[in-house]
């Protein structure tokens, strides 16, 4: 099995993270951030939140006993699904494999990102068709979506 970093699209792997003035001058006490149009008066919502959610990831990492850089925090599953396509799949070239029926966002995100989604029907009793899932995958398959418990059937795999 290849390391996860090798599966990331090269242009994504080499991206520099977005940097704000707060990142660059974070060690200094600065009350006014004119570049961000933030208020210096603390009312609970006067600052933009940390886009990396570093403090929360560190707290979760300590609680779960894993490294903070192994934790993803997003705005729900739709964002995570979309980002998986964007990170791992080359538009117009790669594909993903999924069961059917399942959560509809896998299809929406595939279409949005120009990635072929190969849907494999569940068995008549909603069982997981493992051999057909494996047969649907090829060297261009970058994602396999298994929703458990499945939406909309409710069965767990």
Model regions and ranges:
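Phosphate-binding glycine-rich loop
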Residues: 57-95, 113
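Short beta-strand->loop structural element characteristic of the AMP-binding/adenylate-forming
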Residues: 116-122
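Conserved PLP-anchoring active-site segment centered on the Schiff-base-forming lysine
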Residues: 87-109, 123
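Short glycine-rich anion-binding loops that position phosphate/pyrophosphate groups of nucleotides
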Residues: 37-40, 77, 103, 149-152
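Glycine/Thr-rich phosphate-binding loops of Rossmann-like dinucleotide-binding domains
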Residues: 42-44, 81-82, 106-107, 153-154
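N-terminal "arm"/small-domain region of PLP-dependent enzymes with the aminotransferase-like
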Residues: 1-63, 146
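Active-site phosphate-binding strand-loop segment of PLP-dependent enzymes
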Residues: 124-157
């Amino acid at each position: 099995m290849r390391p996860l970093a090798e599966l990331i699209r090269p242009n994504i792997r080499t991206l520099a993270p977005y940097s704000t003035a707060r990142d660059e001058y974070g060690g200094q006490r600065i009350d006014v951030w004119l570049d961000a149009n933030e208020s210096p008066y603390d009312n609970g919502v006067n600052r933009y939140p940390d886009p990396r959610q570093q403090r929360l990831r560190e707290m979760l990492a300590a609680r779960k006993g894993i490294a903070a850089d192994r934790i993803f925090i997003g705005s729900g599953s739709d964002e995570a699904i979309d980002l998986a396509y964007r990170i791992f799949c080359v538009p117009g070239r790669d594909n993903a494999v999924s069961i059917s029926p399942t959560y509809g966002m896998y299809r929406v995100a595939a279409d949005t990102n120009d990635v072929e989604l190969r849907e494999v029907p569940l068995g008549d009793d909603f069982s997981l068709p493992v051999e057909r899932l494996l047969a649907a995958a090829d060297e261009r398959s970058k994602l396999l979506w298994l929703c458990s418990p499945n939406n909309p059937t409710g069965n767990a795999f």
